[in-house]
Amino acid sequence: MRNLMKITKALSDENRIRVLLALRGGELCACQITELFGLAASTMSKHLSILYQAGLVDSRKDGRWIYFRLPDGKAPSTIKKAIDWISKAA
């Protein structure tokens, strides 16, 4: 039940939905995502953190940069279904 709550919270914000849609095109640096949406870095950091905690995005660090992407094939089916649903609804 806790995972469901994290996912629904993550999907309850338009900016987080837009981030997921942007990541369909591939991995993006947090700075690229922030610039793309024109939000404050701290605001985007919070959105990305919520998406990460819900399992809707993966991240990797390269030096001082953090890159985000949609989860790979190892993601739980619930996560895959949520992302597929968003993609189809957009």
Feature-to-residue mapping (PLM):
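N-terminal helix-turn-helix DNA-binding core of bacterial DNA-binding proteins
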Residues: 2-42, 65-74
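Conserved segment of winged-helix/HTH DNA-binding domains
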Residues: 3, 69-90
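Conserved phosphate-binding and hydrolysis motifs of nucleotide-dependent enzymes
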Residues: 16, 47, 55, 63
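Alpha-helical residues within the helix-turn-helix
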Residues: 35, 46, 52-53
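Beta-hairpin "wing" of winged helix-turn-helix
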Residues: 53-62, 69-70
